[in-house]
From Swiss-Prot:
Function: Chymosin is synthesized in the mucosa of the abomasum (fourth stomach) of young (unweaned) ruminants. The enzyme hydrolyzes casein to paracasein.
Coiled coil: none
Catalytic residues of the enzyme: D92, D274
Propeptide residue intervals: 17-58
Gene: CYM
GO biological process: digestion; proteolysis
Protein name stated in the entry: Chymosin
EC number of the protein: 3.4.23.4
InterPro entries, alphabetized: Aspartic_peptidase_A1, Aspartic_peptidase_AS, Aspartic_peptidase_N, Pepsin_A, PEPTIDASE_A1, Peptidase_aspartic_dom_sf
Class of this enzyme: hydrolase
Length: 381
């Protein structure tokens, strides 16, 4: 079955079927923008909510801490309405709702971004239902409607979309993305909302019920592909991992080792593959073990710094997933900015789940197979 998945997806690519490629560009992170405006320290001090709150929201109210998006840098273009209005969105496999700012939102965050005007769209229909997503320091309030969303060559009609009427604080003011397009399972979506990719599948708008993500380390060639697997973005073979809970893209990690010694996830643990989270997030005790092993030291805001001169001496961290080893070298799990190096590992106090974000996806081409509820991983080029 797994070989058939690859053959069909690659065949579809070669035949030029409904294959949709969305170039992702690497923009300025929210962290860097806040730092430039002198707001980063205040933001970090005010964040009281753990990463895991993103993974506990159901019904009309969802919870997503802003720290999830602090280092996100990969964004793409979509178009909403008739005639189309352009938006930059974060494609997020860790959530399922789709929302953009609207003209009814007067907060600074909305004023600094593209705002959707439903009055100018002949295809917009007001659903008359509220949407609320909690973001640590406040809530995004909005309304739900239907409209046509265009993603590259796909025209997706009658798509539910959230239109924000209020966005929290000033933090989103400096984000390079306007809105968020969730790509997790429909069980995570707000009430009355259908995820964009589900609507595409239901209307047979994609060649295969899967999508794949390549995140270029330099940000120049990053790509989201809907309906196909593109072998030009990886080397070797794809290895398949069963989804254990059909809410997130969740699977079992066997262990995390350094030099053959288990340092985290002993006996196995659950992990989520999440394009909307930038770092590698895990339980506090596990992350502390890893930070100590790689020589990272905690700063006053709870983040971990690394001496850039030590990168060549630091160990490789290996994730074992479904019997396959996925090594991460120091250059993969650290980031460097203006002479400062930071660990790509982040602790979470309130969850035993791991979150494998962009740090992992940059190293491993990722396939999200809804038809068979599998995740495919291969070494990225």
């Amino acid at each position: 079955m797994r070989c058939l998945v690859v053959l069909l997806a690659v065949f579809a690519l070669s035949q030029g079927a409904e294959i949709t490629r969305i170039p992702l560009y690497k923009g300025k992170s929210l962290r860097k923008a806040l730092k430039e405006h002198g707001l980063l320290e205040d933001f970090l001090q005010k964040q009281q909510y753990g990463i895991s709150s993103k993974y506990s929201g159901f019904g009309e109210v969802a919870s997503v801490p802003l720290t999830n998006y602090l280092d996100s840098q990969y964004f793409g273009k979509i178009y909403l309405g008739t005639p189309p209005q352009e938006f930059t969105v974060l494609f997020d496999t860790g959530s399922s709702d789709f929302w953009v700012p609207s003209i009814y939102c007067k907060s600074n965050a909305c004023k600094n971004h593209q705002r959707f005007d439903p009055r100018k769209s002949s295809t917009f229909q007001n659903l008359g239902k509220p949407l609320s997503i909690h973001y640590g320091t406040g809530s995004m309030q909005g309304i739900l409607g239907y409209d046509t969303v265009t993603v590259s060559n796909i025209v997706d009609i009658q798509q539910t979309v959230g239109l924000s009427t209020q966005e929290p604080g000033d933090v989103f003011t400096y984000a390079e993305f306007d809105g968020i397009l969730g790509m997790a399972y429909p069980s995570l979506a707000s009430e009355y909302s259908i995820p964009v990719f589900d609507n595409m599948m239901n209307r047979h708008l994609v060649a295969q019920d899967l999508f794949s993500v390549y995140m270029d380390r330099n940000g120049q060639e990053s790509m989201l592909t809907l309906g196909a697997i593109d072998p030009s973005y990886y080397t070797g073979s794809l290895h398949w991992v069963p989804v254990t809970v059909q809410q997130y893209w969740q699977f079992t990690v066997d262990s995390v080792t350094i030099s053959g010694v288990v340092v985290a996830c002993e006996g196995g643990c659950q992990a989520i593959l999440d394009t909307g989270t930038s770092k590698l997030v895990g339980p506090s005790s596990d992350i502390l073990n890893i930070q100590q092993a790689i020589g990272a030291t905690q700063n006053q805001y709870g983040e971990f710094d690394i001496d850039c001169d030590n990168l060549s001496y630091m160990p490789t961290v290996v994730f074992e997933i479904n019997g396959k080893m996925y090594p991460l070298t120091p250059s993969a799990y650290t980031s460097q900015d203006q002479g400062f190096c930071t660990s790509g590992f982040q602790s979470e106090n309130h969850s035993q789940k791991w979150i494998l974000g962009d740090v992992f996806i940059r190293e491993y081409y990722s396939v999200f197979d809804r038809a068979n509820n599998l995740v495919g991983l291969a070494k990225a080029i």
